[in-house]
Amino acid sequence: MSLLQMSFQGGALILAAALLRALTLHRLPKGTFLALWAVAAARLLVPVSIPSPWSVYALAPAAGESPAGRLPAETVLPGAAPVPPAPAAPPAETGGGIPVWTLVWLAGVLAWGGFFLVSYLRCCREFRTALPADEAPLRERLAAGGLRRPVALRRSDRIAAPLTYGILRPVILLPKTLDGAGGARMTWILEHELTHIRHFDALFKLVLTAAACVHWFNPLVWGMYLLANRDMELRCDEAVVRRLGVDRRGDYARTLISMEACKSGLGPLTSAFSRNAAEERI
């Protein structure tokens, strides 16, 4: 399966998921949309096709075949010399024999991949200055989270809102100015970040980033990248409210409003506690 076929099929899945999302955003569990984005991302990244009679390519005749499944016989008039077929135009190639469009695609992949990598490494370098958060109430809340993976809790003066990063050894980073370690607001914040870790959202963000880099030329993939990141926050909100009680929904909404992420300090692979797309949340 070619890259363009993967991009076309993935784009069709993205359109279907986006339409369903627009119609049922507040009626279906938010995990439903993330499952659909995961299917679309798999189609974009896995070059394997499962034969199906409902496939678009199964409905169309194979290239070079007539509708009957074979080439029509040539009609040659008596005494006329057969006309040789016109040679097909070769694809544009560079001096090394690599098609020009392949080089353009590779350049785009390297450019976007480099952008995301540099952004992530810059954030990691800034986060290294963070200090451990040793407050006893915070440690108790972290221990009550029930996670098997070790989770580090740190404070930094480089961020304005809490965030989470890392997959195998995740880190919850709190702003240095955020106080109230034993308050209700801190309970919401830690539960929010722990929910991101439980759902392996950092790993899914990595998959979405890979799909965006490989299919950088497809605007539908960038739309999926934005909507899927937004749906991760919506699913997280849904899980936090369900876990801590629907009757405290108003307190959680006020916490969302009070938190505004410092966009310049956030990387593409971090999960931040922010009020982005607040009209869709809570």
What are these regions (language model features)?
Residues 44, 49, 172, 207-223, ...:
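Hydrophobic, aromatic-rich membrane-embedded alpha-helical segments
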Residues 1-27, 31-117, 124, 128-133, ...:
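Hydrophobic membrane-embedded segments
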Residues 48, 131-135, 145-147, 198-199, ...:
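Short helix/loop segments within enzyme catalytic domains
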Residues 115, 119-125, 167-172, 218-221:
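Acyl/amide activation-and-transfer machinery of modular secondary-metabolite enzymes
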Residues 152-156:
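General small-molecule cofactor/ligand-binding pocket signal
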Residues 161-182:
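Active-site scaffold of zinc-dependent metalloenzymes
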Residues 187-201, 208, 236-237:
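Active-site recognition of the HExxH zinc-binding catalytic motif
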